């Protein structure tokens, strides 16, 4: 109901305005017969105003507004939607002309009128008659005694509602009309946002938003709908295992109407109707969602846990990564975290994981993490082809099965070097957004494939500020509530990567009241040992216990056991290897230690070649102040560890690649720690040239 536009809600229309004959247009009282005036007019006359025109000097002639019949208000016909005035809620046209009513999907028995004629669809036939659907929730029966001809499932029929029985059953009879008007009967429900639905349990509501996930179950079809305040799951049932609303896929803008219920403590809408929107209305909803996402995605303002010029210089880049991750969460875009399979990479990834999982559950429900999040380790110190192929296959499968967006790829402790290029070129083809948080020496060529790239080398820092340190602070930007549970992770990362940066000492001191340095060292070793056996699995439960996210006694027990096993394996390996280490003094005074890991080390067990070379290097550095380089090699690889030598391993790899034709040299890593690969037949040439290059470097 609203004001009549024809009369501006007055109920009358002015048709003429003329001069008052009593006062000649002056508005002043003249000589008049007081006995002929009413009390009000008498008061006006005594006050000097003309009682005929009320002092205006003119007489206004009006007539009743025909549009609203003098009511000043108009109604909307419940059947045809046209404006009318008067009593009731149906216009005169609809009451006089024969009409057949077509109920919308939202209509129920409360919208029925006994004696009215409706259009329906035959849903099923039985011996005693035919069932007819008048809407999604309204069904009646035509008894066989009232059927003069055969009807089949799917036939459109016109039926008169003869009676609504006490048990709610509808008694229908078929009718035939030569002239009639189809009148669509719509029903609207109040629109809410997803964040308001908890108070609407048991009610029928409408929401508008964007479909971000479609999942077909053995029963209903589950649509996940995103609006400006969050997401809600909507269950639509056609038949068991049959896709409901097949015309609606992910990214569609829709309105959904249905009953609000709780399922496993999560809000769910039991869909009564779902309509796809296009044009201006869809654009408005889309823009509203985007604006809300942009505001919600802003990361939290935090103070870093330790003082660091490098971290301070990286803050803007870290905020950009945090915002991109938060946006993925709140828009229900899947997130894939890739990390190097060592203590630094694992703590970096787990810090982010602990920050985002509560938000993912909050946005998408208790099982959302299984649809919108995955973490995978990378064995190589770069994002290699086996990683990207697996990630793309998983992403495309999820897109085909559930209509999901392609994921946001978050790479930590990897992703900065030329070796990552082949994989990044594939992400570009598929339109997968990539952000990198790393501390390996970066190659600028990768940045063209990345949305964001945070690396201490970009601001004058170096590998001493590890990925675990950066991601610990990044996680707090994403979700500050996880600070207390993850603040020991940067210290574990520092010890695992043997960082000597001042930030390492600061993070270790930060948690000294809870963890001894030896405790943190043990956690780092346990992570390295577990990572070796986990291979491509994320091992979330085991890793959480190692990092003390579960029961304290279990944490202590598993760390102690894994460290005993790891140290035993390392000692066995060194007992075998140390007698076979060959040492020579290079021209620059460097002590070069070389071991053939192919022939003089246990293979396919812990510690792997890189860890073995590192342990040998540490032992050889004890009690030795000279510059030391340890080179562990196999048929087609070499692992380099160094101390006191100004090395740049990525640059050395490029030089070897250019100088030794046919050697197929590639590799990289940090400036002073890395690995090189080459073809087996050129091993002697590569190692000889490598030794020459090391002997010509500056030492300190």
Regions found by a protein language model. Give the residues of each.
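N-terminal small/polar loop signature for handling phosphorylated ligands or for N-terminal nucleophile
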Residues: 235-237, 344, 358-435, 442-445
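A structured phosphate/pyrophosphate-recognition subdomain
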Residues: 330-337, 341-342, 444-599, 616-617, ...
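Structural detector for short beta-strands of small beta-barrel domains
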Residues: 112-126, 157-161, 201-218, 258
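Short boundary/loop segments of OB/S1/cold-shock single-stranded nucleic-acid-binding domains
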Residues: 95-115, 148-150, 179-203, 244-245
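Glycine-rich, acidic loop segments that terminate in or are immediately followed by a histidine
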Residues: 480, 593-700
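OB-fold (S1/OB) nucleic-acid-binding surfaces
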Residues: 126-128, 133-142, 213-240
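OB-fold/S1-family single-stranded nucleic acid-binding modules
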Residues: 167-189, 261-288
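Short nucleic-acid-contacting surface segments enriched for D/E, G, S/T with interspersed K/R
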Residues: 147-158, 240-257
């Amino acid at each position: 109901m609203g004001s009549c536009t024809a009369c501006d809600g007055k109920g009358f229309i002015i048709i003429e305005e003329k001069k008052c004959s009593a006062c000649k247009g002056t508005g002043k009282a003249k000589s008049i017969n007081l006995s002929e005036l009413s009390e009000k007019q008498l008061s006006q006359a005594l006050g000097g105003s003309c009682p005929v025109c009320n002092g205006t000097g003119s007489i206004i002639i009006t007539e009743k507004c025909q549009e609203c019949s003098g009511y000043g208000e108009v109604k909307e016909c419940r059947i045809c939607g046209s404006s009318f005035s008067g009593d009731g809620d149906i216009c005169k046209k609809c009451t006089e002309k024969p009409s057949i009513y077509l109920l919308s999907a939202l209509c129920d028995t409360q919208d029925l009128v006994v004696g009215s004629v409706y259009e329906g669809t035959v849903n099923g036939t039985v011996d005693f008659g035919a069932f007819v659907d008048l809407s999604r929730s309204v069904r009646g029966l035509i008894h066989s005694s009232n059927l003069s001809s055969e009807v089949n499932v799917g036939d459109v029929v016109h039926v008169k509602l003869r009676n609504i029985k006490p048990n709610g059953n509808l008694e229908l009879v078929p009718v035939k009309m030569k002239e009639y008007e189809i009148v669509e009967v719509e029903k609207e429900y109040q629109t809410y946002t997803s964040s308001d639905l908890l108070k609407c349990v048991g009610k029928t509501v409408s929401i508008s938003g964007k479909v971000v996930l479609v999942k077909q179950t053995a029963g209903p079809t589950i649509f996940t709908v995103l609006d400006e305040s969050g997401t809600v799951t909507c269950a639509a049932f056609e038949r068991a295992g049959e896709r409901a609303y097949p015309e609606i896929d992910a990214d569609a803008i829709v309105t959904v109407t249905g009953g609000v219920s709780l399922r496993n403590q999560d809000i769910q809408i039991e869909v009564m109707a779902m309509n796809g929107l296009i044009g201006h209305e869809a654009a408005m909803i889309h823009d509203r969602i985007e604006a809300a996402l942009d505001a919600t995605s802003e990361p939290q303002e935090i103070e870093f846990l330790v003082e660091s010029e490098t971290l301070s210089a990286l803050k803007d880049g870290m905020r950009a990564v945090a915002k991109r991750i938060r946006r993925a969460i709140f828009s229900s875009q899947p997130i894939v975290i890739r990390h190097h399979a060592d203590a630094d990479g694992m703590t970096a990834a787990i810090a982010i994981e602990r920050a985002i999982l509560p938000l993912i559950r909050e946005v998408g429900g208790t099982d959302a993490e299984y649809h919108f999040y995955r973490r995978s380790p990378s064995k190589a110190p770069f994002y290699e082809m086996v990683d990207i192929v697996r990630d793309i296959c998983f992403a495309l499968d999820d897109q085909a099965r559930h209509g999901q967006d392609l994921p946001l790829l978050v790479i930590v402790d990897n992703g900065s070097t030329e070796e990552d290029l082949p994989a990044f070129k594939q992400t570009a083809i598929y339109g997968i957004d990539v952000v990198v948080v790393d501390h390996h020496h970066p190659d600028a060529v990768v940045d063209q494939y990345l949305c964001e790239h945070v690396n201490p080398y970009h601001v004058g820092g170096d590998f001493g500020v590890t990925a675990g340190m950066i991601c610990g602070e990044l996680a707090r930007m994403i979700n500050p509530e996880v600070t207390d549970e993850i603040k020991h992770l940067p210290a574990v990362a520092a010890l695992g990567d043997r960082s000597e940066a001042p930030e390492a000492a600061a993070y270790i001191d930060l948690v000294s009241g809870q963890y001894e340095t030896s405790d943190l060292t043990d956690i780092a070793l346990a992570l390295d040992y577990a990572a070796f056996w986990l291979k491509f699995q994320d091992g979330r439960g085991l890793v959480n216990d190692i990092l003390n996210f579960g029961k304290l006694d279990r944490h202590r027990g598993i760390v102690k056991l894994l460290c005993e096993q790891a140290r035993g394996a390392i000692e066995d390996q060194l007992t075998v290897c140390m007698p076979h280490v060959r040492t020579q003094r290079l021209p620059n005074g460097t002590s070069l230690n070389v071991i053939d890991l192919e022939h003089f080390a246990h293979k396919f067990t812990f510690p792997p070649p890189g860890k073995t070379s590192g342990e040998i290097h540490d032992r050889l550095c004890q009690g030795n102040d000279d510059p030391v380089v340890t080179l562990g090699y196999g048929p087609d690889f070499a692992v380099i560890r160094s101390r006191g030598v100004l090395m740049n391993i990525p640059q050395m790899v490029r030089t070897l690649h250019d100088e030794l034709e046919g050697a197929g040299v590639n590799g990289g890593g940090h400036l002073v720690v890395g690995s090189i690969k080459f073809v087996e037949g050129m091993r002697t040439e590569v190692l000889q040239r490598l030794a020459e290059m090391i002997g010509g470097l500056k030492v300190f």
